[in-house]
């Protein structure tokens, strides 16, 4: 079945017609942005390793933290990360030899997109996510980024609170409609 992405720039009657035809909201995402020119970078509280390329440690930890077990996903996802055009910043936090946090910054002109912020369940609420974001934002700013954006699943209040504490502000919401 077809899946439609709906955003505030679209005529609201289209969304209404989809609803009337049995298309339900499947996923809602909030987009947040910040101006890095006025951002006062603070040092990360946890030690964050930054690399321009994906590592197997990073990828394996991402699969584990996401609960990814599908062998097809495990085969395809690495090629997607390797195919990212432009400069990337991969952030990793370790506890000994174990990866306990990941993050990704993708630089595009004067923007950095922040993605894949994950912290292992036993390490949450210890400022690790904040440290990852701080390290990515600082590095992106040093590489010429003036603005940052990210997407957060609507209802993920912990993540939204973290991003707001860093200076991100809500910009808009988009959602997907599909028939079930």
Positions of predicted regions on the chain:
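C-terminal, charge/polar-rich interaction regions
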Residues: 112, 125, 129, 146, ...
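Conserved GNAT acetyl-CoA-binding A-motif
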Residues: 1-8, 140-151
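Conserved acetyl-CoA-binding loop-helix of GNAT-fold acetyltransferases
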Residues: 116-119, 125-138, 142, 161, ...
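Conserved active-site alpha-helix within GNAT-family acetyltransferase domains
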Residues: 11-25, 130, 154-173, 180
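Short amphipathic alpha-helix that is part of the acyltransferase structural core
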Residues: 29, 40-75, 94
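A conserved beta-strand-loop-helix scaffold within acyl/acetyltransferase catalytic domains
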Residues: 71-122
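Acyl-donor-binding surface of acyltransferase catalytic domains
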Residues: 1-46, 177-178
